A protein has these predicted regions:
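Intrinsically disordered, low-complexity regulatory segments in ankyrin-centric signaling systems
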Residues: 1-41, 138-140
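Conserved ankyrin/ankyrin-like repeat signature
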Residues: 34, 66-67, 99-100, 129-133
Length: 140
């Protein structure tokens, strides 16, 4: 068996790529029940795509608060930055996803993580309600 065969690497295995794509789509679409089954089967909550986006980033950016909460419950790193230095909280602030911002904040996401951070994005876009939320200690 040659170790030079790229198809022997799980990253290049077409079945693994297809499964990962499906899981990322579940997060992007907010299909929490189906995603929960994969998480229960051992898929890591911090699964990351080729842009550095975690499942949490995809769910947050697309406004799926229940999916974000599910990922929080499964131990997702809420401050993990993508390849552009963005956090899930900053993505939710940028998109104006109030429910997602609240879930992430309540679970302890750092409003100062990343560049621009969620706090910086809130200031840039005049979202004072987020700045007020970030000033309060997280409710755990």
């Amino acid at each position: 068996v040659s170790t030079d065969d790229p198809t022997s690497d799980p990253v290049h295995d077409p079945e693994v790529v297809t499964l990962a794509t499906k899981i990322f789509q579940l997060a992007r679409r907010g299909e929490s029940e189906a995603l929960a089954a994969y998480l229960a089967a051992g898929v890591p909550a911090d699964l990351t795509n080729d842009n550095g986006d975690t499942l949490t980033m995809l769910a947050a950016y697309h406004g799926h608060a229940a999916t974000v909460a599910l990922l929080c419950e499964h131990g997702a790193d809420l401050d993990r930055l993508n390849d552009r230095g963005q956090s899930p909280l900053a993505g939710a602030v940028f998109k104006g996803e109030d429910a997602v911002v609240r879930v992430l904040t309540e679970h302890g996401a750092d409003p100062h993580a990343g560049a621009p951070s969620a706090a910086e994005a809130a200031r840039m876009f005049g979202k004072d309600q987020y700045l007020d939320l970030f000033a309060d200690p997280p409710q755990r």
